[in-house]
Amino acid sequence: MAVPKKRTSISKKRIRKNIWKRKADWASVKAFSLAKSLSTGNSKSFFVRQINKTKK
């Protein structure tokens, strides 16, 4: 089994963790933006089938 030779420094660990967090934050911002545009009907890149409910 492969074993690392030296311990990873705290600063390197923090840098990698921050990169991972930044990617997650960006994904959440994009998802929220898409949800907002869908709810207002201003979406130009995502198509939703609208069901018209009319009472007769």
UniProtKB/Swiss-Prot annotation:
Organism name: Platanus occidentalis
Gene Ontology molecular function: any one: structural constituent of ribosome
Compartments where located: Plastid, Chloroplast
Keywords assigned by UniProt, alphabetized: Chloroplast, Plastid, Ribonucleoprotein, Ribosomal protein
Family statement: Belongs to the bacterial ribosomal protein bL32 family.
PANTHER family assigned: 50S RIBOSOMAL PROTEIN L32, CHLOROPLASTIC (PTHR36083), LARGE RIBOSOMAL SUBUNIT PROTEIN BL32C (PTHR36083:SF1)
Cellular component, GO annotation: chloroplast; large ribosomal subunit
Organism superkingdom: Eukaryota
GO BP annotations, alphabetical order: translation
Pfam families per UniProt: Ribosomal_L32p
Coiled-coil regions, chain positions: none
Name assigned to this protein: Large ribosomal subunit protein bL32c
Main location, first listed in the record: plastid
